[in-house]
Amino acid sequence: MTILLRVLFIVASAALLAALLLLAGLLYEWIGGGVDRRKLMKPGRLVGIGEGRQLYMVERGPRGRGPAVIFESGFGATSLNWLHIQTALAERVHTVAYDRCGLGWSSACTSERTPRHVARELRELLRAAGIEPPWVLVGHSFGGLVMQRFALECAEEMAALILIDPMRPVEWPPFNAGADGRVRRAQRLTRVGGVFARVGITRLAARSHFCRSARFSGFLIRLAGRQGEFLAQRLDTEIGKMPAEVRPSIAAHWSAPRFYRGLLAHLEAVEATALEMHEAEAIGDVPVTVLTPASAAPPANMDQYGPRGRHMIAERSLHWIHLDEPELVVQTILNAVAQAVAEDRRAQPMVAAVD
């Protein structure tokens, strides 16, 4: 009986300790999330787009000096990706970067994360924020497909389209069966991250990795095995190219349970995204610039970008061209804005003559 009581006591104590740790983790995440929102959201603002949804956006530069430049990020990325580009353009161009539903500081997503749905949410944001056309749209990776869809649906409001190594539908399921396993592994890893995020473990890891000694995050990375180490290395490589002041915000985003729900929604829509954009029609009379790294094959079908499409190679870049060669992206944007302004001026006398 004495042995049984001891066993029961040990089990009960372990269960109580586990419950207390779980409660502490939940409380840590709840408090940390609130502190993050109060401290880190200041550069931008939340804009309502209907049905209770809000999108977080950051504006830089003066309005009214030519077309506004609108940025769209890749998978899992937010407006932070464009901060250095916005800063470089701030004195000459009006720019807007934002977080898609499900990512960053924006509301949870309520629709499938395909280019069509995301482009419509962006259109609602621009309308609600009073960002008038014409626009120069800039999209990276998945964001390139979003901006391509936007250009197809709102061609008359476009000034130019700049695609930075856009996602290629033929490289993803269902067209590339070999990528299916990679997508499924990413989904599983994201689900695990979401569980850890709810109890504060991801917050500890993110703070450790981005803002402190990285000992705790290093332990978790080793625990995740080869895939975790590969992912961490890629993140370090790309995030290391971003301004140091954004790291607390990156840590905050990667700490939040809603981030993993949003990222999972994007991953679950990969096949639908590939199908939608593989069958997309060609863009009309809009200037389109496609930037790809030298290590990538050129676009297989430039016809999809219309009669004014052109291809440029970023010689010193990998996939994240706007981080590897920001000066190239800045100059490409300035050229597009200048061309749009010049074309608008040439059109004005023609409009007056018709009137």
Q: Where are the model-predicted features located?
A:
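Catalytic active-site module of serine/aspartate enzymes centered on a nucleophile-bearing elbow/loop
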Residues: 4, 307-355
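The conserved beta1-alpha1 loop
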Residues: 70-74, 140, 165
